[in-house]
Regions:
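Conserved NAD(P)H cofactor-binding loop of Rossmann-fold oxidoreductase domains
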Residues: 93-98
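Canonical Rossmann dinucleotide-binding motif of NAD(H)/NADP(H)-dependent dehydrogenases/reductases
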Residues: 1-30
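Hydrophobic/aromatic anchor residues within beta-strands of the central parallel beta-sheet
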Residues: 54-56
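Substrate-binding pocket helix/loop in short-chain dehydrogenase/reductase
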Residues: 87, 101-102, 106-114
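Conserved glycine-rich Rossmann-like NAD(P)H-binding loop of the short-chain dehydrogenase/reductase
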Residues: 25-42
């Protein structure tokens, strides 16, 4: 049975490259994206071209109030797309960077960083 990985922030950067690498190792994937559906669809197409299954779902990891709805969506997708009820592992990759010196970082920027990375 193929393993299924859920990769947050899987539409670009490290998440994208992790998705592509796992696909070549025989993993099927659920990847998330925040805004750029087209980029996520490109990753899904590349994963499928390598012979793995993949689906992309929207998720803003900074909005913890949306997690229950996201979990419900994953529970729907797993049997529909993969014939399973659970995924095997999580790559918790989604995140942001504040490109400023700490002293120049606003409280709002710092709060957003903490919301996404730690909450």
């Amino acid at each position: 049975m193929r393993k299924i990985a859920l990769i947050t922030g899987g539409s670009r950067g490290l998440g994208k490259h992790t998705a592509l690498a796992l696909a070549t190792q025989g993993c099927d994937l659920i990847l998330t994206y925040q805004q750029n559906r087209a980029a996520a669809d490109e990753v899904v197409s590349a994963v499928r071209a390598s012979g793995a299954q993949a689906v992309a779902l929207p998720l803003d990891v900074g909005r913890s109030q949306d997690f229950a709805a996201f979990a419900a969506r994953v529970a729907e997708v797993l049997p529909q797309q993969f014939g399973r009820t659970q995924f095997d592992f999580l790559v918790n990759n989604a995140g942001i960077g504040i490109h400023a010196f700490f002293a120049d970082t606003s409280e709002a920027q710092f709060d957003q960083l903490m919301q996404i990375h730690l909450k």
